[in-house]
Amino acid sequence: MSEEQVNIKKKEKWGIAHIYSSFNNTIIHITDITGAETISRWSGGMVVKADRDEPSPYAAMLAARRAAEEALEKGIVGVHIRVRAPGGSKSKTPGPGAQAAIRALARAGLKIGRVEDVTPIPHDGTRPKGGRRGRRV
């Protein structure tokens, strides 16, 4: 490899895309590789008008596209993705927007590195809501 190619590789700036997806909303937060500095932050509620549309895959796609555009402007070429559901005593599965957000980030031109699930899992934490016999449907 020549010196020019080495310099190009060094200048590639990567970030982390934190995708928090619940059944009420989807939040896409792109940070630098350390996670300390915010580069872009968008949510489903920022891109659609109706409250009922916030958790939809469409809203997640729009939010992810806007976040990716901002990140590309600031020089980010690729992201590692960290998907998170509410977790704890709440739902441990990501909402409907998580998949759509990942796809939208890839389509927007960002390289995708690792995809990992960082949902908090309780090691015998608080008691789940619903009482002794659970929610009766």
From Swiss-Prot:
One of its GO terms (molecular function) is structural constituent of ribosome. Keywords: Ribonucleoprotein, Ribosomal protein, RNA-binding, rRNA-binding. The keyword Ribosomal protein applies. It comes from the Archaea. Residues 116-137 are annotated as: Disordered. GO terms for biological process: translation. Pfam families: Ribosomal_S11. GO terms for cellular component: ribonucleoprotein complex; ribosome. The keyword Cytoplasm does not apply. InterPro entries: Ribosomal_uS11 (IPR001971), Ribosomal_uS11_archaeal (IPR019961), Ribosomal_uS11_CS (IPR018102), Ribosomal_uS11_sf (IPR036967). Part of the 30S ribosomal subunit. Located on the platform of the 30S subunit. Belongs to the universal ribosomal protein uS11 family. This is Small ribosomal subunit protein uS11. It comes from Pyrococcus furiosus (strain ATCC 43587 / DSM 3638 / JCM 8422 / Vc1).
